[in-house]
């Protein structure tokens, strides 16, 4: 006969309890996964989401701890922190709303993808940014500034429009107009330079866009061929507003050193205060590049190029008209107080003899036929995008939200840094 000691009985009891706990944990995990799948199916069903009982279930708040209920309540978030989705038929946008089809661009913090909205069947360019990468470089202010600028310029024909923005715990999503005529940079690389009428047309549309931004007290600061797109008809569309500076009035200045080396104005290199005329310098640099094939003071050696911008006189070859020479000399004036646009901003550019052939009212209404048609056959025509992007596989993580149970502390911290990012347009913007 086997006699069980007290220790043996305790070990047996502990083993049974541990086994029961393991079974219970496995059961709870399975139920939780099943419940999560069930809720996801409901959330993805637009008809179910409209049912009052379903809405009340999805809005249940977690119970508060008794000791917390009597604690001093936290102050309400400031207006800039509140998530304002607005009255919209799609107030809870999420990655699974889209089919992400192709990578069409890349940047420091993420990718731009061609996406088709599943319900609307509409095509968009979705800019997907990694929050942790943004925070690591302390660029969250620039990202929120880009969002704010996009909200302001949705009505202008030569500025890319933001349809809505949303976020997951680890990513930000800008849902933008899909523009597939190619970057101006791409077309310049292929053709080396443009004839003067074509360069004038593009410069006029760019100037119109910059003038509109200035009317909103926004300085663009990063004009370059890579940020200038052509739409399917051949009109200019300005994109990428990450370096925009808001609240710069007519005589206001700022001093942040930023931009792209080839297009930096002398006052920026000198680290002096600068104003809206920095954009007119950049317009001059882009116009020069369209006419001659390279930026005006270009050198492969960045230090030499900076010295050229600061000290080298502007050299113009004789193969352009006198009005083109005059406008380039005015825009690329090293002294910003004497630069074309210093007194009356866009009106000076608009009234310059170089643009005398432009009917500005027809231009803004897109009644002028562009000098070049990209001839795209439809949204799936990607011929004007760099194959380096379009041949890259679409990451699986782009189209799904991370499991909240698996979020790390750093991801949660990143999630909290972009309160107020999400945006949906008011209903009247769809009318």
From Swiss-Prot:
<feature type="region of interest" description="Disordered">
    <location>
        <begin position="64"/>
        <end position="92"/>
    </location>
</feature>
<keyword id="KW-0067">ATP-binding</keyword>
<dbReference type="GO" id="GO:0005737">
    <property type="term" value="C:cytoplasm"/>
</dbReference>
<feature type="modified residue" description="Phosphoserine">
    <location>
        <position position="397"/>
    </location>
</feature>
<dbReference type="InterPro" id="IPR017441">
    <property type="entry name" value="Protein_kinase_ATP_BS"/>
</dbReference>
<keyword id="KW-0547">Nucleotide-binding</keyword>
<comment type="subunit">
    <text>Homodimer; disulfide-linked. Forms a trimeric complex with FBXW7 and NOTCH1. Interacts with MAPK3/ERK1, MAPK1/ERK2, MAP2K1/MEK1, MAP2K2/MEK2, NEDD4, NEDD4L, MAPT/TAU, MAPK7, CREB1, SLC9A3R2/NHERF2 and KCNJ1/ROMK1. Associates with the mammalian target of rapamycin complex 2 (mTORC2) via an interaction with MAPKAP1/SIN1.</text>
</comment>
<keyword id="KW-0053">Apoptosis</keyword>
<feature type="region of interest" description="Necessary for localization to the mitochondria">
    <location>
        <begin position="1"/>
        <end position="60"/>
    </location>
</feature>
<feature type="modified residue" description="Phosphothreonine; by PKA">
    <location>
        <position position="369"/>
    </location>
</feature>
<dbReference type="GO" id="GO:0005634">
    <property type="term" value="C:nucleus"/>
</dbReference>
<dbReference type="GO" id="GO:0006915">
    <property type="term" value="P:apoptotic process"/>
</dbReference>
<protein>
    <recommendedName>
        <fullName>Serine/threonine-protein kinase Sgk1</fullName>
        <ecNumber>2.7.11.1</ecNumber>
    </recommendedName>
</protein>
<comment type="function">
    <text>Serine/threonine-protein kinase which is involved in the regulation of a wide variety of ion channels, membrane transporters, cellular enzymes, transcription factors, neuronal excitability, cell growth, proliferation, survival, migration and apoptosis. Plays an important role in cellular stress response.</text>
</comment>
<feature type="active site" description="Proton acceptor">
    <location>
        <position position="222"/>
    </location>
</feature>
<keyword id="KW-0472">Membrane</keyword>
<dbReference type="Pfam" id="PF00069">
    <property type="entry name" value="Pkinase"/>
</dbReference>
<feature type="modified residue" description="Phosphoserine">
    <location>
        <position position="74"/>
    </location>
</feature>
<feature type="short sequence motif" description="Nuclear localization signal">
    <location>
        <begin position="131"/>
        <end position="141"/>
    </location>
</feature>
<feature type="domain" description="AGC-kinase C-terminal">
    <location>
        <begin position="356"/>
        <end position="431"/>
    </location>
</feature>
<feature type="modified residue" description="Phosphoserine">
    <location>
        <position position="401"/>
    </location>
</feature>
<keyword id="KW-0496">Mitochondrion</keyword>
<keyword id="KW-0963">Cytoplasm</keyword>
<keyword id="KW-0808">Transferase</keyword>
<feature type="binding site">
    <location>
        <position position="127"/>
    </location>
    <ligand>
        <name>ATP</name>
    </ligand>
</feature>
<feature type="modified residue" description="Phosphothreonine; by PDPK1">
    <location>
        <position position="256"/>
    </location>
</feature>
<keyword id="KW-0539">Nucleus</keyword>
<feature type="modified residue" description="Phosphoserine; by MAPK7">
    <location>
        <position position="78"/>
    </location>
</feature>
<keyword id="KW-0418">Kinase</keyword>
<keyword id="KW-0723">Serine/threonine-protein kinase</keyword>
<dbReference type="GO" id="GO:0106310">
    <property type="term" value="F:protein serine kinase activity"/>
</dbReference>
<dbReference type="InterPro" id="IPR011009">
    <property type="entry name" value="Kinase-like_dom_sf"/>
</dbReference>
<dbReference type="GO" id="GO:0005739">
    <property type="term" value="C:mitochondrion"/>
</dbReference>
<dbReference type="GO" id="GO:0005886">
    <property type="term" value="C:plasma membrane"/>
</dbReference>
<dbReference type="InterPro" id="IPR008271">
    <property type="entry name" value="Ser/Thr_kinase_AS"/>
</dbReference>
<dbReference type="Pfam" id="PF00433">
    <property type="entry name" value="Pkinase_C"/>
</dbReference>
<feature type="domain" description="Protein kinase">
    <location>
        <begin position="98"/>
        <end position="355"/>
    </location>
</feature>
<dbReference type="InterPro" id="IPR017892">
    <property type="entry name" value="Pkinase_C"/>
</dbReference>
<dbReference type="InterPro" id="IPR000961">
    <property type="entry name" value="AGC-kinase_C"/>
</dbReference>
<keyword id="KW-0832">Ubl conjugation</keyword>
<keyword id="KW-1015">Disulfide bond</keyword>
<feature type="compositionally biased region" description="Polar residues">
    <location>
        <begin position="81"/>
        <end position="91"/>
    </location>
</feature>
């Amino acid at each position: 006969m086997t006699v069980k000691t007290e220790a043996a009985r305790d070990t047996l009891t502990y083993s049974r309890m541990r086994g029961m706990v393991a079974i219970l944990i496995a059961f709870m995990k399975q139920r939780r996964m099943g419940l999560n799948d069930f809720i996801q199916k409901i959330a993805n069903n637009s008809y179910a989401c409209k049912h009052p009982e379903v809405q009340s279930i999805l809005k249940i708040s977690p119970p508060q701890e008794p000791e917390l209920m009597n604690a001093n309540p936290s102050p309400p978030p400031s207006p800039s922190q509140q998530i304002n989705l607005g009255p919209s038929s799609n107030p809870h946008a999420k990655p699974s709303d889209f089919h992400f089809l192709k990578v069409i661009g890349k940047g420091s913090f993420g990718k731009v993808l061609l996406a088709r909205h599943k319900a609307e069947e509409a095509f968009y360019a979705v800019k997907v940014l990694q929050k942790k990468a943004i925070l690591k470089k302390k660029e969250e202010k620039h990202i929120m500034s880009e969002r704010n600028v996009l909200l302001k310029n949705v009505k202008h024909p030569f500025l890319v429009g933001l349809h809505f923005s949303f976020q997951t715990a680890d990513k930000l999503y800008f849902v933008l107009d899909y523009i597939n005529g190619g970057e101006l940079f791409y077309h310049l690389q292929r053709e080396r330079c443009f004839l003067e009428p074509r360069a004038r047309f593009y410069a006029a549309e760019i100037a119109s866009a910059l003038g509109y931004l200035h009317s909103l007290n926004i300085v663009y600061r990063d004009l370059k061929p890579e940020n200038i797109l052509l739409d399917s008809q051949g009109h200019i569309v300005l994109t990428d507003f990450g370096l925009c500076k808001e609240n710069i009035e007519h005589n206001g200045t700022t001093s942040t050193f930023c931009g792209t080396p080839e297009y930096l104005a002398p006052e920026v290199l000198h680290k002096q205060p600068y104003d809206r005329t920095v954009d007119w310098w950049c317009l001059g640099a882009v116009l020069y590049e369209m006419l001659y094939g390279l930026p005006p003071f270009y050198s492969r050696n960045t230090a030499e190029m900076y010295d050229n911008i600061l000290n080298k006189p502007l050299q113009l070859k004789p193969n352009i008209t006198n009005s083109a020479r005059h406008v380039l000399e005015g825009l690329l004036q090293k002294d910003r107080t004497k630069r074309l646009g210093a007194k009356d901003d866009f009106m000076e550019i608009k009234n310059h003899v170089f643009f005398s052939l432009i009917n500005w009212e027809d231009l803004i209404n897109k009644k002028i036929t562009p000098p070049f048609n990209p001839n795209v056959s439809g949204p799936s025509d990607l011929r004007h995008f760099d194959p380096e992007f379009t041949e890259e596989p679409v990451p699986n993580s782009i189209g799904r939200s991370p499991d909240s149970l698996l979020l790390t502390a750093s991801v949660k911290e990143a999630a909290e840094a972009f309160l107020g990012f999400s945006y949906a347009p008011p209903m009247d913007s769809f009318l």
